[in-house]
UniProtKB/Swiss-Prot annotation:
Involved pathway(s): Amino-acid biosynthesis; L-tryptophan biosynthesis; L-tryptophan from chorismate: step 5/5
A Pfam family: PALP
Subunit structure: Tetramer of two alpha and two beta chains.
Function: The beta subunit is responsible for the synthesis of L-tryptophan from indole and L-serine.
Coiled coil location: none
UniProt-listed GO biological process terms: L-tryptophan biosynthetic process
Gene Ontology CC entries for this record: cytoplasm
Family per record: Belongs to the TrpB family.
PANTHER family the record matches: TRYPTOPHAN SYNTHASE (PTHR48077:SF3), TRYPTOPHAN SYNTHASE-RELATED (PTHR48077)
Protein known as: Tryptophan synthase beta chain
InterPro entries assigned: Trp_synth_b_CS (IPR006653), Trp_synth_beta (IPR006654), Trp_synth_beta/beta-like (IPR023026), TrpB-like_PALP (IPR001926), TrpB-like_PALP_sf (IPR036052)
Gene: trpB
The entry's keywords: Amino-acid biosynthesis, Aromatic amino acid biosynthesis, Lyase, Pyridoxal phosphate, Tryptophan biosynthesis
Amino acid sequence: MKSFLVDQDGYYGEFGGAYVPEILHKCVEELKNTYLGVLESEDFKKEFDQLLRDYVGRPSPLYLARRLSEKYGCKMYLKREDLNHTGAHKINNTIGQILLARRMGKKRIIAETGAGQHGVATATVCALMDMECIVYMGKTDVERQHINVEKMKMLGATVIPVTSGNMTLKDATNEAIRDWCCHPADTYYIIGSTVGPHPYPDMVARLQSVISEEIKKQLMEKEGRDHPDYLIACVGGGSNAAGTIYHYINDGRVGIILAEAGGKGIETGMTAATIQLGKMGIIHGARTYVIQNEDGQIEEPYSISAGLDYPGIGPIHANLAAQRRATVLAVNDDEAIEAAYELTKLEGIIPALESAHALGALKKLKFKPEDVVVLTVSGRGDKDIETYLSFNEK
């Protein structure tokens, strides 16, 4: 049977690998040779599970959304990652990676962030574990996510606004990598998504796989079977999607639907629909689909959602799309906003703009009444209230 998980060289099919500058080769090799031994050790698992339970508040609920189910003619469950401490799925990964960094003897943590959720989650765990924390964030994102910036500062992190390029997630990642090049000995770079050189995509997917592990148990309790008919998640880099599908990736009974950011429309050039528009390239150390021009220069992506405007895609998802294991839909800004308002009015849950893209995919799908569908609400919408309000006023 074909496996959609990573091979020993860090590839998912033809996607992935580790293309890094020579100065970082030693750091990436050290990480590659260390991560599995630590993640699979009993003492790590014990500490990780205890923190997920007592600090994050896991397991996150699997909620049967009755009014949404009625509207879309199926049994619609929401995996409530928005209810985690810090308000998103990101903390599952930051706890795991910072526990790893501590075991590797690193004293300084650096991170990139787009919507600010990964930055807040990193700053939170650094405060908990008494580690120095530096977060790189594009100036555009600093302005549109200022509440998260203030939270990071309150938690003791240094937030560095990045003024190169489009001043968004890609540029923040570039600066974080530059910092890592300058401080390879004492610094651990914590990537927030399933992107970057191997072993990051696999490590982040493993740490987020607690999501699908819980879905299996929760569905068994609620439905008497451990698998849904469909899983739906939004993808930027792809960490919440990877966590949602991890334990089902090789299970042909389960349909995988990924919603990427269509922006103002995939034909407009103002988009972040990487899987649909990207060509094979290398970005931040991985071979994957990249939005690029005819000369191979990376194009600036656009999305109303700060967490989805990335011009690449995690290699795990690029491979799923290439092998037709996943259905990929582009959801435009206005469709996502409309879906967020719909969830709020039907179920009393205000989702993050990123999660709203997964909800926006529902109108593009047809379900049977007996279908069991699980959609991951990756984060809560507090950080996006101003965007929702300004869009509604138009």
